[in-house]
Design a protein with these regions (language model features):
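Conserved "HGTGT" condensation-loop signature of ketosynthase/thiolase-family condensing enzymes
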Residues: 1-144
């Protein structure tokens, strides 16, 4: 197998946005989990919540993809100059030779859970406001 060059990395997690807060948390042996109140849960839950994700505005042409998961992806593009590094690599090598590898998240699931709560009582149809293919679908973030 031919080795691949990795020329830019970043991370956006409950530890913070970018590599610096991630490294700091690892060195300090600090978790990103915090006790949270969540929806209608009656007991406290320790969650890894990405700060600032709810305030992110996606580009106008990608509004159909608006969900927490894709807002976190947008934060990743903005962190550590990652989007600029991808553009530079595409310019240098051609877009067909550049790959972006993504981790997974369940952060978009709440939007789908809320949609299921509002299904049509007679038909069972989900609300038109749920853009499943652009938000909860497994491939949503890579399409975004």
């Amino acid at each position: 197998m031919k080795p691949l060059a990795v020329s830019a990395i970043t991370a956006v997690t409950a530890l913070g946005h970018g590599l610096a807060p991630t490294l700091a948390a690892l060195r300090e042996q600090r978790t990103g989990l915090k006790l949270q109140d969540f929806e209608t849960a009656t007991l406290g839950a320790w969650l890894g919540v990405v700060e600032g994700a709810d305030e992110v505005a996606l580009p106008a042409d990608l509004q159909a993809y608006d969900c927490r998961n894709n807002r976190i992806a947008e934060l990743g593009l903005r962190a550590d100059g990652f989007a600029q590094a991808v553009r530079a690599a595409a310019q240098r090598y051609g877009a067909q030779r550049v790959g972006v590898f993504l981790g997974t998240s369940t952060s978009g699931i709440l939007q789908t859970e809320i949609a299921y709560r509002h299904r049509d009582a007679s038909s069972g149809a989900l609300p038109a406001s749920l853009h499943y293919g652009e938000t909860h679908n497994t491939y949503s973030v890579s399409r975004y």
